Amino acid sequence: VTDHHLPALVHDAIVLPDANVIVNPNQPGCGFASKALAGVGVMFYVLLALRGELRERGVFTQQTQPRLDALLDLVALGTVADVVKLDANNRRLVAQGLKRIRNGQMHAGVAALFSAAGRDPQRAAAFDFGFALGPRINAAGRLSDMTLGIECLLTDDAGRAAELAKQLDTINRERREVEGGMREQAEAWLEDLMAKQADTAPPALAIFDAGFHEGVVGIVASRLKDRVHRPTFVFARGQDGLLKGSGRSIPGFHLRDALDLLAKRHPEVLKRFGGHAMAAGCTLDEQHFATFDAAFQQVASEWLDAATLSRTLLSDGPLGVEHFNAQTVHALDAQVWGQAFEPPVFVDEVEVVSQRLVGEKHLKLSVRFGGVVRDAIWFGHSEPVDATLRLAYRLSVDAYNGRERVQMVVEAAA
């Protein structure tokens, strides 16, 4: 058995699978230093160790041994898509995988997914794994048959890979529609809840609706969490009639430990649970949902203080005008950014020259910065802004008709 999750606790005792061999950097007594490995990273190191052992036994030599570096595109994709902490070791794995992809050395399925997503593999970045390829692979498991994604990554047939990537792209579009409907419903519920509490969100959120789709509860939980900065669980009814919940957390609130405490206080509520600090899942009977909701809020009220509940945006300060160019963007994009290793966010004073809505929910801005009018976009923000303000932003390049234009992607404004 290979795994990377924290072992299960039953009555304060760690319970491990009944297996001859268990490889998990997070099990007790494991001295492997890199505890943040994703499942694909664990398996990669198992293969490295196995290759070394077989080489010692004379099964093959240094020259005839399998080339495991050919797997690094898959290791990089899985590491980012699983949203594990990008510590030094994980960044190393992702960087090597990206290097191979940019050089055209990738599995047929990875190349097909880049094509289906309209992304350029020669400029591959960790962003592509998390927001382009990963969602398409995961969509199959959420709404259809997860083996589609697996086959796409494993096939050596470029034609078959392209066919599967198109199917995954179609399923992902369906996933977005399902998610959009659930999200609107959840946000309406949230607005109603906050209206009853003087526009103040409770310390934690738990929402269930009979119409929710089990496959996208985690995505909706993440969206709600981002909106109100609260630990959030979203539940849907599974095929077995039980409620399946997926949770997302905020820094300072260990979600799996919270479930463990809840289970101790209310042993009748949770049938199963597991996960990490920032993401977890659980299963319960529908009759226990109200108890779960109250108990989850109680744990949150005990563990969270005002500072933790306040959203904090860390910045890298102002950006020198001389660095506001495509070369800077490409240099940053070439690095490995992600969970717990965020890309730079800059903060500068700007004068708003014009502003308008695009797509009904995004604010398009022209701002004067460094004596030059620049483009800026604030995704998901539809309210007008003041004439002068401080923008927290990331840099991106918008390519059109072969020309590159640098724009600010707004994170916040004050």
Question: Regions from the language model: what does each represent?
Answer:
Residues H288-F292, T388-A414:
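OB-fold single-stranded nucleic acid-binding module
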Residues L313-R374:
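Accessory interdomain/linker segments of ATP-dependent helicases and helicase-like nucleic-acid enzymes
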Residues L259, R368-P384:
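Beta-strand/loop nucleic-acid-binding surfaces
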Residues D18, G52-H288, P318, L357-K361:
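Hydrophobic helix-and-loop "lid/oligomerization" segment in the mid-to-C-terminal part
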